[in-house]
Curated annotation (Swiss-Prot):
Keyword Hydrolase among record annotations: no
Signal peptide (residue range): none
Lineage, uppermost ranks: Archaea, Methanobacteriati, Methanobacteriota, Methanomada group, Methanococci
Species, as recorded: Methanocaldococcus jannaschii (strain ATCC 43067 / DSM 2661 / JAL-1 / JCM 10045 / NBRC 100440)
Keyword Metal-binding carried by entry: no
Residues noted as binding ATP in the record, renumbered to the chain: G308, G309, T310, G311, S312, G313, K314, T315
UniProtKB keywords: ATP-binding, Autocatalytic cleavage, Membrane, Nucleotide-binding, Protein splicing, Transmembrane, Transmembrane helix
Changes after translation: This protein undergoes a protein self splicing that involves a post-translational excision of the intervening region (intein) followed by peptide ligation.
UniProt protein name: Uncharacterized protein MJ0781
Family: Belongs to the GSP E family.
GO terms for MF: ATP binding; ATP hydrolysis activity
């Protein structure tokens, strides 16, 4: 009886254990099922047939890179994206050029073996397990395929796909990491991505993104740059951390779906040697521009404007020319997109800032930056692109070059023999034209008085003689603070602001410096009859001042004679512009919204016209002409144009045309003959030829040779013979 009861108890205990074990398993299964269901609900589905959808109009582009009768392989190379590499094939077929990623075929075949549930589970697990390395993802996929008995044909390719999709921008990472590309363009949903290749130009890719993927990428970029983009703010314009510029739109304003355009920031910018290789310009023209931009060792740098249409390579040329600046100059760059890469030591890079919705004060325009840059004592200003009123500020900078002014009681010497205090002279016009006063951000007000035809004694820095020049503007602003007072051995005196330029002699050259840099013992230029002479500075002091300070704008020379006891000679930046010719550039500058007075264009030395043209079935970039702006063009004309270089389409080359007045001016200032200037240009051609023949084209290397020439030309020439 006891035994029977024990057996019954034992049986009951065994049944209880079995029941507990079974219920535990069922509970685990239920929890696992709930977890999977939760993952399915929270995870974004990535359908394999949308991200890599074949391109219907040209189905051959999704094939592997094989050459048929009607197709030609133009290029093949690999793109490294952190831990992985992706092959790229450039193919021409029936007049189209395609940028193909052959790995997409393998990825398609592998994804076709997976269901949406598989995809969701894989993504969830990779994220939850923190698998960020390619080898980790590959190992996980290998185990996954074995566990579920899946015949995945290309595990390596599938691992690359998930490596790019999770935490990155998907297959768009391939063109974004290709340094040979200038631009990546997503034109909407379920359409091919296009790219602009430096060598092969516009190409259609076999990368097609669906709505979810395009929106995800744009949202990721917006979060990265901390900028909104939605139905209320349907456009985004910002910079990626690497300097690339991104523009995005939502489907609210673009009919084919959201768009994305990324202008890539080049890690290896083109140099003058690259442009010579491309045929954009030749060695002779390059040597001329080197000499002009540098100004023959800084004697007279040329103010230069680059004009051209969209995609003509204006900014690339500007970056190339910027390398020719003297190695020790203070350079300020002003751009919408930070593209200029100048390897000099003393460079300040400034970028505009667009307004935000409801925050117009957040905007910083190019005009704002130019005006601010002028207060930063730059030797050079490079402006990325001129579109509006900043053109006026830029030309004012070229014409005046400073914010300095004189004290009220400083005499000025008019051409009719009258000597009058500058304050009295200027105040008269401020009273006469009180309704025509224009204001600048630096506090100055000014009035145009060119129609008054009042002439003043002016110092010609080239001929070193005194000339009669017309006063174009009068300037005035309120000031309280310290002024500089300079006294010479012959008792000449002048009191002016610290930043007003005067002229001293140094090693036989005319040197323009600010008043605060004048030292006792310097020899300063003074007028004597109708020529110029030197007087020794015996005293430089600061004095307190409270009242208005004054200045003039004088045509041509931009100098005038001012100061007590017969006075002193006192004084009064490159950019790109959308235009298809020098004439169109001038028309745009002098028309709304730029409205630059024609008289101010004489501050420009050269206009370079660069365009994108079609030749032998290819799009190429060429300098089509270099025009010089010279003062005076006959009666009723403020300036004249001389074509120095002109493109010959038959020969595909630039040919020298007219006589260059800048060459005459720089010879006068530098104290050299025309033969010496041309001999120096030949030497520069030797340097460029050496770099070209030896394929020395990297930015840092080309810049080093230019700097070495500027420091010691003969030493460099000996080293390359």
């Amino acid at each position: 009886m006891i035994i029977k009861n024990q057996l019954i108890f034992v049986n009951f205990y065994v049944i209880l254990i079995i029941w507990w074990f079974v219920m535990g398993i069922l509970d685990k299964i239920q929890k696992k099922s709930e977890k999977i269901e939760k993952e399915k609900k929270s995870e974004t589905v990535i359908p394999s047939d949308t991200k890599l959808k074949p391109i219907e109009p040209h189905p051959t582009i999704n094939k592997k890179a094989t050459v048929g009768n009607d197709e030609t392989i133009l290029d093949t190379y690999s793109i490294k994206i952190d831990e992985i590499e992706m092959e790229v094939v450039i193919k021409r077929e029936e007049g189209y050029i395609y940028y193909l990623v052959p790995e997409i075929d393998k990825i398609n075949m592998s994804l076709s073996k997976l269901t949406k549930d598989h995809l969701n589970h894989i993504k969830s697990q990779i994220s939850d397990l923190g698998l960020i390395e390619y080898d980790q993802i590959r190992e996980y996929l290998t185990n996954f395929s074995m566990r579920y008995n899946l015949a995945i044909p290309y595990i390596d390719s599938l691992a690359k796909f998930f490596y790019l999709v999770i935490g990155r921008l998907g297959l768009l990472e391939v063109p974004l990491n290709d340094d040979r590309l200038e631009e990546v363009m997503v034109n909407g949903y379920n359409v091919p991505v296009f790219v602009f290749h430096r060598k092969h130009q516009m190409c259609e890719t076999n990368i097609v993104l669906d709505r979810n993927e395009v929106d995800r990428i744009i949202e990721s970029i917006a979060n990265l740059v901390n900028r909104p983009i939605d139905s209320r703010v349907p456009m985004l314009d910002a910079f990626l951390p690497d300097g690339s510029r991104v523009n995005a739109t939502t489907a609210d304003i673009t009919m084919n779906g959201a768009t994305l355009t990324i202008r890539k920031f080049s890690k290896n910018p083109l140099t003058v040697i690259d442009l010579i290789n491309f045929g954009t310009l030749d060695i002779d023209t390059a040597a001329f521009l080197w000499q002009a931009v540098e100004g023959y060792f800084g004697a007279k740098p040329a103010n230069t404007l680059i004009a051209g249409g969209t995609g003509s390579g204006k900014t690339t040329l500007l970056n190339v020319l910027s390398l020719f600046s003297m190695y020790n100059e203070r350079i300020i760059t002003i751009e919408d997109t930070p593209e200029l890469q100048i390897p000099h030591k003393h460079v300040i890079k400034m970028v505009t800032r667009p307004a935000r919705p409801g925050m117009p004060e957040y905007e910083v325009t190019m005009d704002d930056l130019i005006k601010n840059a002028l207060r930063m004592r730059p030797d050079r200003i490079f402006v990325g692109e001129v579109r509006g009123k900043e053109a006026h500020s830029l030309l004012v900078a070229m014409n005046t070059g400073h914010d300095g002014a004189l004290a009220y009681d400083e005499p000025i010497y008019l051409s009719d023999g009258n000597i009058i205090n500058i304050g009295e002279f200027v105040d008269k016009f401020f009273k006469k034209y009180k309704n025509s006063i224009k204001k600048e951000d630096n506090g100055f007000g000014w009035i145009d008085i060119g129609n008054e035809n009042i002439y003043i004694k002016s110092f010609n820095k080239l001929s070193l003689i005194i000339e009669d020049k017309r006063i174009l503007r009068v300037w005035r602003k309120k000031y309280s603070g310290k002024l500089i007072k300079i006294t010479t051995k012959n008792r000449r005196e002048i009191t002016l602001t610290h930043d007003h330029p005067v002229y001293i002699s140094k090693t036989g050259e005319v040197l323009e410096i600010n008043a605060e840099m004048v030292k006792v013992g310097d020899y300063i230029y003074i007028p004597k009859n109708n020529t110029i002479n030197l007087d020794e500075v015996i005293k430089v002091e600061t004095v307190d001042y409270n009242g208005h300070i004054y200045d003039l704008t004088v045509e041509d020379n931009h100098t005038y004679i001012a100061g007590k006891n017969e006075g002193f000679a006192v004084s009064n930046c490159s950019g790109t512009l959308h235009a298809n010719s020098a004439d169109e550039a001038i028309l745009r500058l002098t028309s709304p919204p730029m409205n630059v007075p024609k008289i101010m264009l004489t501050a420009l030395n050269f206009i370079i016209n660069q365009q994108r043209i079609r030749r032998a079935g290819k799009t190429i970039r060429r300098i089509l002409g270099i025009v010089e702006i010279v003062k005076g063009g006959g009666e009723g004309h403020e300036f004249a144009k001389t074509t120095l270089y002109e493109y010959n389409g038959l020969k595909d080359s630039l040919e020298r045309r007219g006589i260059c007045m800048w060459e005459e001016e720089v010879c006068e200032i530098a104290g050299i003959t025309k033969e010496e200037l041309l001999r120096d240009r030949e030497n520069r051609k030797k340097v460029l030829s050496y770099l070209y023949k030896n394929n020395i084209r990297k930015l840092e290397n080309v810049s080093d040779y230019i700097m070495r020439y500027q420091v010691d030309p003969e030493k460099l020439l000996r080293s390359i013979r």
